[in-house]
Each structure stands twice: as structure tokens, then as C-alpha cells.
Amino acid sequence: MDETGKDATRLPVGTDRYVLGTAVQTKIAGKPVEGPVYEFAPVINTFLREHLFGDIFGRDVLDFQDRELATAAALASLPAETQLRSHLKGCLNVGLSSQHLKEFVTVLETKVGKSEAQMAARLLDDILQQ
């Protein structure tokens, strides 16, 4: 049986979740996030910033590196290529090395599947060549 981890520390009273979420989202993306989907439905980005990046990423249960790596693994297993590309870039933006991500691809092959690992390797190679 897995050990239960610690509870998340609550955000300080008065924390502006939108401001916090915007800062977290920008750090992971490496730049401010914008684009047609957010212009078409701006509330989507508000929900992402306040809830996902503010409420969840802003807590201290997982650091950004672990959270991005877990997200990349989930996306590779779906497979969700466009989102995986974005989160592999996010892994680099939060400090994971290219070597760490190459090892991640090796783990994907043994734990998830060969085709998923090949997709991740192709995306990673493309990202690293940019």
C-alpha cells in the first residue's frame, strides 16, 4: 500500500488566484499564454489560471518538475500529441534537463508502450533542435 502524502498547504488568505495562476502558467509555458482559443472563450483561460495553475499548481504537494513530468506521462499515454509537445517544453522551462527527458522516454517505453515512447522521442527531438 502506498503511503499517504502530506496535505497541501492552503494558499494564504487574500491570495489572488488569477495573479498567482498567471505567474505559474507563464513560468511553465516560458511566455505569456495567449491564442485563438483564449480569444474565442476567455473564460477558459480564467478557469485554467485560477483553478489549475493557481489552486492546484500553486500548492506545495508536488514541485513544478514532478507535476510537469506526471502531466507529460499522462498525455503520452492518451496519446495527446499537441498537449504533450507543450508540456515537454514546460518540463524544460521548469528546469528538467534534456537528459532527464530522454530517460523519461525510456521509462515510457517500458511502462506505457513503444508507440507512445516513439511519439514522445520524436517530439522531444524536434523541441531540442529548435
Q: Language-model segments: which ranges?
A:
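Short loop/beta submotifs within extracellular cysteine-rich repeat domains
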Residues: 78-84, 113-114
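Accessory, usually C-terminal, subdomains that scaffold auxiliary metal cofactors
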Residues: 94-99
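Short conserved catalytic/interaction loops centered on acidic-Pro-aromatic/His motifs
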Residues: 81-89, 102
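Acidic, glycine/proline-rich low-complexity segments that act as flexible tails and inter-domain linkers
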Residues: 1-64, 93, 106-130
